[in-house]
Amino acid sequence: EYFSSATQIGMTATPKADEGANNLDYFGEPVYTYSLLQGIQDGFLAPYRVTADFINVDLQGWTPDEGEIDLLGKEIEQKLYQRQNIGRDLAIKLRRKVVAHRITQMLYDIGRMTKTIVFCSDIEEAAEMRTLLINMNSDLCKKSPYYVTRIVGEDKEGKKQLDNFISVDEPYPVIVTTSELLSTGVDCKTCGLIVIDKEIGSMTEFKQIIGRGTRLRKDKGKWHLEILDFRNATAKFKDPSFDGDPEPVSYTH
């Protein structure tokens, strides 16, 4: 209200459309839009390629045996657990090992020093994913204890490595596991692989996550972005409100 008499200019990369916080309701239609697709075509942003990786338990769901107990000794409710429950309501250790293995496989394909962000369902899963990736990449972890690092709000040691991760000159950390912390406000110009292993509800959050890897740094060998998707989040690329198509998608099971 104080600035109501002034001309107000709004600029955003991910406009909000929440009830009570809708950019279009407040400012009206944008007077100028520069889309992600146009930025890629003009050579300012990195083109991206999607690998959609579907795990059997995600496709078929999982039902515990009658009387089956969890790691804490509590009986698991007998019902069909869908992909949306896994990670949030239910942790399947074998599934996490499969995810870590496939991340490692991709890094062997694209370069094991490719800076990578792994988005997990919560901070506990981010911690276990870090441990699994350390075990599967022990040779490089011997060279640096920060080859795989968890960066979450509650981990002070991990947060200390954030500046090193986003630096174009620091090689470590290489793989970062997180939940929410790195989805916004982090400019990691050399991030070459984004791994999605969490349910993403909103288009805004999806754009923010993809945006962590859309920077170009040709002088550092960053020409494009790889996206490894375990949660079918990249189906949002087909949404008419998303501006920018990926290169051909590959699917694995």
Model-flagged regions — what are they?
Residues A21-T114:
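Interdomain helical connector at the RecA1-RecA2 junction of SF1/SF2 helicase-like NTPases
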Residues T252-H253:
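Conserved small/polar residues in nucleotide/adenosyl-binding loops
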Residues L36, Q105, M136-S138, L181-S183, ...:
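Short beta-turn/strand-loop junction motif enriched in small, turn-promoting residues
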Residues T7-I9, P47-Y48, K115-I117, Y147, ...:
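Beta-sheet entry/capping signal
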Residues E1-T51, V57, C188, L193-Q208, ...:
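Signature of the SF2 helicase/ATPase Hel1-core->accessory helical subdomain module
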Residues I151-P248:
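Conserved RecA-like P-loop NTPase helicase motor core
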Residues Q82-V176:
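Conserved C-terminal RecA-like helicase domain
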Residues V31, S35, L45, L94-V98, ...:
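Charged, alpha-helix-enriched surfaces in structured cytosolic catalytic cores
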